[in-house]
Amino acid sequence: MKITFEIEYRTRWGEELVLLLGKRRIALQYADNGIWSGTAECRRADDGASYRYAVECAGACIRTEWYPHRLRLGDLPPLRRLRIRDCWQELPADAPFRSAAFTRGIFARTAAPSRAGRPARGLHPQQGVLLRVVAPDIRPDERLGLASECIDNWQRALPFDDAAFPEWSCALSLPEGAAYKLVVVGRGEVRPLLWEEGENRRWSTPAGDGFLVDASLQPRFPERRWRSAGTAIPVFSLRSRESFGVGEFLDLKLLVDWAAATRQRVIQLLPVNDTTMSGTWEDSYPYNANSIYALHPQFLRLTAAGVAEDDEYRRLRDELNALGEVDYERVNRTKERLLRAAFARCGARTASRADYKAFVETNRHWLLPYAAYRCLRDEYGSADFAQWGPYARYERRKVEAYCMAHGREVGFHCWVQYHLHLQLSEMSRYAHSCGIVLKGDLPIGIGRTSADAWQSPRLFHLDSQAGAPPDAFSAVGQNWGFPTYDWERMARDHFAWWRSRLHKMSEYFDAYRIDHILGFFRIWEIPAGALHGLVGHFNPAMPYEAGELRRMGFDLSDGRYTTPPLDEQTLVAIFGDLADEVRRDCIRGGRLVASCSTQRGAAARYPGDGEHDRRMREGLLTLLDDVLFVEDPYRRGHYHPRIAGGSTHSYRRLPAWLQEAFARLHDDFFYRRHDLFWRDSALRKLPVLLTATDMLACGEDLGMIPDCVPETMRMLQILSLEIQRMPKTAGASFASTADYPYLCVCSTSTHDMTPLRAWWREERTVTERFYREVLHGEGPVPEECEPWLCRRIVEMHLASPAMFAILPLQDWLAMDEGLRAADPEKERINVPAIPRYYWRYRMHLTLEQLLEAEDFNTTLCDMIAVSGRN
């Protein structure tokens, strides 16, 4: 079949259009009136293939479409020639609705697709016209239609077929010049409910030979601000009668049932990747995965993987489920023991199945290195691959030989991943069947001793650490310990590592939270020897050159501004009565001795928990933070102002005029100097990632936000995160929920914050201000955040313009006296200020009990409905 592709596009001098169909590049010819066309020989086997138009100049591609087109031939009559008229697919205003969150989840067609608009096979092969229109925001109880003056004088609409939703099709032929409009009709109805804006369209019988597929129409419907609600909870926090001391993937079925029963549409999870490194509770941190692909074995339902449900199993399950929190070490030890016994019994039988072989083959590029990593970690007793002798450096052939030699152990880890894949895939399909979206979490970092760092070390700066500057979560900044990315190297293959990562994630999730989206603009990079985040710097950045700083009054040649002050006044201020000991044991020749010259060294020298070691350790860490400038590690002689340098002793020692100079250059550096630079940095990365899959992207944009971030997120239609307690307006104590943007996720708190009830207790002055200014309360401020207060706060979020109000389960339950936890302090998931925190929160009631709480569920359902969500 010969297919002629046509598109209207206004080029500039020297530009030309090409069609990219699979591996084919087809040069288009310019006709007139801005129309370009080209012909390609296609077969029925090409049905479903994607293609894009691109603009080239002097042989180089300078612009491509945001969305691909899809070649759909299955609903056409037998043809020798076909013409397809397209329109350029730029990022549209309805981009979020084109995501899998809506097309496979919220607006997915669960009923049999309508065939009303599919008489294409009955049209004459040389005269027919098939309209194809992309309209993703048509709800499941609605259909796209076409109304015309010549179809019952506008009173009846011809419905389109939604078999390829969000693309709609309708085969028809109207009289030349007939007026028509696209409309929305109720499912099973013909009378228009919603009309296109603007003037009537006029039917024009296309010139030329062959059947025409006209995909150039773009709907002009008025914006309808659809909104919904959801719940955020880590998988490990789920509790059911069948779970084994920790939440499991199959527990999501009950959570989906509850969400559907209460009119919610989204379930937001924390990362679910394997974090096994030390084998201790420290592996409970979900953002330090050992693989960006592998799922955590703790989430496996053992009985569904072949573990016998015998007396021992039931005893262990009941013991672990009786605990108020997750016992990470015992749960994972016990699960692995039972899984190994099941693998010995039925692993060989599973390995012979065709679907298992297909899973291994499809995922071979990461699965075998991951399995080898798990084996080597056990063999050498450490996840630090630098200690693995001949395997310290990843070599593909050597690792493949290792896998062959250790086939049974490698096979065990592949078998576990296979069952995890089956169970999470089952939950994803079940959520789709209920119109529920599973929203995943994309961590900004990777584990320093992960399989990813072992397999692809050149993609990372393994000699640095990622973190965050000081903010509301931590006064000394955050040090996550992750290596930072070598973005320049990643860009060489068009960010293939990221595209592969997101593709795997999209097998299970329809939406995702981009953890610390600022990291795609710039990352806070911390020296390897530091523990705090204060002496970090942004990367990429434009640090000041030494001569530039000299002209501002800062001569850095003698090191006075780049090394800690060791004068008597500073030492006494920091160490008090220990100042003499510091001077005697830690300083030689006017410098700190080697063992105290880095924060890691100081912590190692004074590791004890007693008061002396604690004071010495914390004092040295504070002293080492006390500098005004940090030298750039990539460009010697270039310097970054130390973040929040105005709080240092070094700053207080400056004369007033120099303090003013530092304040000016500090504020310019952190709030103005990099705005366009960081925007351009993000625009080189984010569009590639956003178009890698059809998942809905939501950014975590809290903290120190330069102006370029919200601007870029709006441009790319990435949903922002709005937290009432973390206002983005300078000088505001609390954000106004009524002023939230539409394209955002709003929430009462995050996993890094205290839930409502514990927050109410934290700072009485803050909660009193909130009670007076936000809730307009009168009289004494309640000592506790009582159910009626929690409901008021929740209602404010539900009433906001935000597309999604996704609240922690703890804050939903806080509205009900009978369901809320007895101790709100036990509901905290993470404390960012504590570097090694035990992530073990587990909901205090079972999901079965939650489903049986009819009064609460009815109340919640009514609240969501009254708020206009869903």
Show the residue positions of the predicted features.
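C2-type phospholipid-binding modules
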Residues: R83-I84
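Aromatic-rich carbohydrate-binding modules that target alpha-glucans
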Residues: K2-G48, E56-P77, G128-A179, V185-F211, ...
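Short intrinsically disordered, low-complexity coil segments enriched in acidic
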Residues: R24-L28, Y51-E56, R614-D625
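Extended cationic-aromatic binding surfaces that line active-site or macromolecule-binding grooves
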Residues: S50, E56-C57, G186, V266-T275
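Catalytic cores of glycan-processing enzymes that make or break glycosidic bonds
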Residues: A93-R121, Q126-L130, L174, E199-N870
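Short beta-strand motif preference
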Residues: Y51, Y180, T231-I233
